[in-house]
Design a protein with these regions (language model features):
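Core nucleic-acid recognition elements
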Residues: 9, 36-263, 280-286
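Polar, glycine-rich mid-to-C-terminal structural blocks
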Residues: 407, 422-495, 499-502
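Short, surface-exposed, low-complexity cationic segments
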Residues: 14-32, 107-121, 263-270, 732-737
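Terminal amphipathic helices with adjacent charged low-complexity linkers/tails
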Residues: 80-85, 164-196, 428, 514-536, ...
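Internal maturation/activation junctions in enzymes
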Residues: 288, 330, 590-613, 639-721, ...
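Alpha-helix capping and helix-loop boundary segments enriched in small/acidic/polar residues
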Residues: 9-13, 33-36, 98, 102, ...
């Protein structure tokens, strides 16, 4: 028996549809009804259809359902059913109008699916049609009509109707897929393999994919693609992917689908795996990325699968105290910036203003003039005009040039001493905070590092903790050393004034960092990176010799350098708002996959400078972080300002840490440990002792690590994720949201931003960052830090009514709680720039 649909098409009769319609009418009134009574009414309708073949249309059947409900005395249900039919009819008419106006019949399927999935009145197609009508003009092209429809859906997004950002993404996805399909047909790209081959020949795809995978493997991998996962993307995320991440041809047309992008990244990151099980890892990585459970850092997301595969986010260099060394560091920065990386530079070894040079007294110009060169390099090397370079410059709080350094970005003072395009950061020892807490009026001595080395025979910056304190006090008491004496109150005033005015300097608590360093047997950590989440061993690059040699008849100058430790950050983030955080077994599996992927980045990466490659291969450091922190709390109805928050995240980060350590150890068993495992805190067990990991479960992990080793010297680092959190449709990094809803202006239109999964239930869980008591954020950071071997991009949010004392108290609390770094101090009246390199 066949039924005629409204559009004239014929389909096979299905009594289940009648049963569902009747059930929904009872659900709408909350009235109970037995299955037998529903079955009886379905039979009556069915009998009518059999007896009246001329009335076998959808409309006639629905009329009969109405009469059947009333015949059984279910008048309220019949009334709601009639209303439902009316609304459905309205929806159909609205969809027909949109499809007719846009002259795009295929669009009807998209809109009907949306209408089925979003049944609330606030997401009616009638509402969309009315908004769309206000943007249409006579004679509009199909392209412009679809643009107008997308704009209409975007502008309907409000706190009361947040799902319009998902609906607008559906229409945007439809438009994008249709354009790509048309392009594929023009080029004859009928399979994924043909497409990869074409993009490789065009220089859009790295040839290494075809060199490592057969045609059969690539086409099998293509079966992993699930187009339904496009529905997970909101408008902002999909728009960002289409504009900045998917591959475009040389005419600027998008040629790569979003799901193909995720698969291409997975194919690249799984390349080092054994051929036999490699496609399994491709699938696992693809699943994590396409489900938005994990985001790779911006360089990895953008450059994987491409010819220029620079996959690392941030780099850190120790600037030596020599002309050759300083200019080498500048060159290193320019190369890193050229390929889209961000930079951290430690200037604590460079002699201060008034220092000696080759015996000439008082002639050194200090660090500021070199930092101005760094600033100019950041502006000049602007990544093909895309954006200028980004760099944080670190200086110790006892360096003689500190007062001028603290005014680098402020608006007052001599402009010749300014560098407005770099980000200053200060390295603090425990002693400074102790003295600040005891008595702000105490004096603090500032020294030249070169003079200390020349007179005392040691480098103060090369030690930490009690040893540093002993040597610093020795310097204070040695009258042979010149110094600048300034009260701690004046230093704090300069720091806080700059923080409120510019958001910087960033904070690096050097003793806290180095005490927790699992690889202290191999070096010092002088500073962090651009976004303050990396903490790894550092050492300056040194020139050993310059020799003139003859090679193949040519005279060449050969410079020999000792490579030092040039830190590299390979980042990814777990999207906490999308993960089963309470299921430890599932978390172990997902963490193991992303740790493997990050470890493979080390082998696959293109390195802008050779020193970075050497350090990365020796330490094999990775930085697994998180995004969606506030999202995860809100969806579980956990308030930010609560002990429940601290307890929950303590458990979550312990779970992530344990999973990451086991994953790295299992990788070491399979592929070998990093070069310096012997003697590390991992090997001796000191890592576990320092963190109080003494449960039976942790003791098993400790034994496993001692037996198998560790593949990676450093594991966890929480980056800001400002861009990639938009892709994942979640909150950025560790930050609380600024607003539940706001409008962002982009190219003349207003883009709505909505807190993830905003609803009546989550609304009050999303308290604004500026309304949150910052002590809760600092305490939470301390709780997490125990489980993070590196550091966190943690911001402080202050309002105009904060006093300097209140801000200082937050710094002191962070130090006491064991927080390693503080990123921006975000004043409500201040807009600070985002780092995109570390956006994982």
């Amino acid at each position: 028996m066949n039924i005629t649909k409204r559009n004239g098409e014929v389909e096979v009769y299905n009594n289940e549809k009648i049963s569902i319609a009747i059930k929904k009418s009872f659900i709408s009134t909350g009235k109970d009804v037995s299955d037998s009574e529903i079955a009886g009414m379905v039979s009556e309708v069915e009998q009518f259809i059999k007896e009246n073949p001329e009335l076998r249309t959808v409309e006639d059947i629905q009329n009969r359902v109405e009469k059947c409900l009333m015949a059984h005395g279910h008048y309220d249900e019949a009334k709601n059913y009639i209303l439902f039919r009316y609304q459905r009819n309205e929806q159909r008419q609205a969809i027909n109008y949109i499809v007719w106006t846009a002259d795009d019949r295929e669009l009807a399927d998209v809109l009907h699916n949306v209408a089925r999935e979003y049944r609330e009145r606030s997401y009616s197609m009638v509402t969309l049609q009315e908004k769309f009508s206000s943007f249409t003009k006579p004679g509009m092209s199909q392209k412009d009509s679809i643009e107008a429809l997308i704009k209409a859906a975007v502008e309907l997004t409000t706190p009361e109707a947040p799902a319009w950002e998902m609906i607008s993404a559906r229409i945007l996805s439809y438009r994008s897929e249709k354009k790509i399909t048309r392009l594929e047909e023009e080029l004859g790209l009928k399979t994924f393999y043909r497409k990869v081959k074409y993009m490789t020949e065009e220089g859009l795809y790295g040839d290494y994919i075809l060199q490592n995978y057969s045609e059969e493997e690539i086409n099998e991998a293509a079966t992993f693609i699930d187009p339904e996962r496009n529905k997970l993307l909101n408008y902002s995320g999909l728009d960002l992917l289409l504009k900045r991440y998917v591959i475009k041809n040389y005419s600027g047309k998008v040629i790569e689908r979003v799901q193909e992008m995720f698969l291409g990244i997975a194919l690249h990151l799984a390349m080092p795996e054994e051929k036999e099980g490699r496609l399994m890892w491709v699938r696992r990585i693809y699943d994590l990325l396409s489900k938005l459970e994990v985001t790779m850092a911006t360089p990895t997301l953008s450059n994987s699968r491409k010819p220029s595969h620079q996959l690392s986010s941030c780099f850190i260099d120790t600037v030596p105290d020599s002309l050759d060394g300083i200019y080498r560091s500048l060159d290193n920065f320019s190369q890193v910036s050229k390929f889209g990386g961000g930079m951290g530079m430690y200037f604590g070894k460079v002699r201060a203003t008034g220092g000696n040079i080759r015996g000439f007294k008082g002639v050194a110009g200090g660090v500021i003039r070199w930092m101005r060169l760094v600033n100019d390099t950041a502006v000049a090397v602007d990544q093909l005009g895309m954006r200028q370079g980004a760099v944080a410059v670190y200086l110790d709080v006892w360096h003689k040039d500190l007062p001028e350094f603290l005014q680098l970005r402020t608006n007052n003072g001599d402009d010749r001493m300014k560098a407005h395009d770099i980000f200053p950061a200060i390295c603090y020892p425990d002693l400074f905070w102790k003295m600040a807490e005891e008595d702000m009026n105490q004096n603090w001595s500032l020294f030249c590092p070169n003079e200390i080395m020349r007179i005392k025979g040691y480098c103060l910056e090369d030690c930490y903790g009690e040893e540093w304190e002993r040597k610093y006090l020795d310097c204070v008491n040695d009258q042979r050393l010149s110094r600048r004496v300034i009260s701690i109150k004046d230093i704090v005033r300069l720091v806080l004034r700059s923080a409120v005015e510019t958001g910087t300097p960033f904070t690096f608590n050097r003793d806290t960092v180095n005490r927790a360093n699992p690889n202290a047997h191999k070096g010092m950590i002088y500073c962090s990176n651009l976004c303050t989440e990396i903490a790894q061993n550092m050492a300056p690059i040194e020139t050993v010799s310059k020799e003139v040699e003859t090679k193949d008849g040519d005279t060449v100058v050969v410079t020999t350098t000792r490579p030092g430790e040039f830190v590299v950050c390979n980042l990814a983030s777990l999207s906490l708002g999308r993960l089963p955080l309470e299921d430890e077994e599932k978390m172990k599996e997902k963490v193991a996959t992303v740790v493997r992927a990050l470890d493979n980045v080390i082998n696959l990466n293109f390195y802008p400078v050779p020193y970075a490659q050497l350090t990365n291969q020796r330490y094999r450091s990775i930085g697994l972080g998180i995004s969606g922190y506030h999202h995860a709390l809100a969806k579980r109805r956990i308030k930010w300002e609560s002990e429940e928050h601290l307890q929950f995240m303590d458990k979550v980060f312990e779970t992530i840490n344990r999973a990451a350590i086991l994953a790295s150890s299992n990788l070491a068993k399979e592929k070998g440990s990093y070069q310096f495992f012997e003697g590390s805190d991992w090997q001796t067990g000191a890592y576990f002792d320092k963190r109080g990991y003494d449960s039976a479960e942790w003791q098993d992990v400790r034994k496993t690590v001692a037996l198998q080793g560790m593949r990676n010297a450093y594991l966890l680092a929480v980056a800001p994720t400002s861009s990639t959190s938009i892709i994942a449709g979640t909150t950025a990094g560790l930050d609380p949201i600024m607003k539940r809803f706001f409008l962002e202006e982009k190219k003349g239109s207003m883009l709505p931003r909505v807190a993830p999964e905003l609803s009546d239930e989550t609304y009050w869980m999303y308290k604004s960052a500026y309304l949150i008591n910052q002590k809760w954020s600092v305490r939470a950071s301390g709780v997490r830090q125990r489980h993070i071997d590196q550091a966190q991009s943690m911001n402080l949010y202050i309002t105009n009514d904060f006093t300097m004392r209140q801000i200082l108290d937050l710094y002191l609390l962070a130090w006491k709680e064991g927080v390693k770094t503080i990123y921006y101090v975000r004043s409500k009246s201040l807009e600070v720039e985002e780092c995109e390199s570390c956006s994982s």
